[in-house]
Amino acid sequence: MLDRWGADALRDSDGTKLDAATKALDAKIYTTYFVARGHNEFAQEHMDECQQMLLMSKHNVATENTVTIDFLDGYYREQVVADYVHDPKKWWEVIDRTTGEVVPVSCWEVDQDKDLVTIKDAVPFHEYTVSFFVYAIWDPTQMYNHITNNWGDKPHDIPFDVRQANSGAFAKDYLKQWLIDNPDTDVVRFTTFFYHFTLVFNDQAKEKFVDWFGYGATVSIKALEEFEQEYGYALRPEDIVDNGYYNST
């Protein structure tokens, strides 16, 4: 087949591996390498270092002075979970979309057991949204391949954030050892690299929104803290979610 197709290289892919006999053929060997996923044993011990995203709830119309928002409604809960490690009152944002005003943190509360935000002193018939941080607990590229190819009970790859101390050190150390352990590899094919393009799924496990040039999957609380430290001003959640447009391009 190599001769008939004129191939000069062989490569694996997400979900496949080349066996030793194949790697010994007279061809260049490309090996897929995942920098920040595919290491669940490490990731499960550092779930507070999962990659993060800022998402926005659906627009919810208040019909009385109190409105409760299921902010994860419409999102795939096998992909994301709300971040309660960090204080929602500091990092989340509730907005009256009718006026564009930010709702004071004193006027809303989070039910962490039910993933709900309740707003008091709401204006009837105004629309409200919640912008909130999540942890990504399933790598979206592997999730797409997993669902499309019906991989069944194959474990879900947990993406970790190399900006974090433990994850960054693990990624460096693992790569050094991997290079030693894979002498037959001619080309390391980095896949996903550190972060994804923006890829978020809905509650039917279908693509909810995709931005091939988006940076939404690079946003984390640590990143925002470091941004403020370097530039002297803080970004708001709205700078990222952009009323649901996610500031694409």
Where are the predicted features?
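Glycan-processing catalytic domains of CAZymes
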Residues: M1-T249
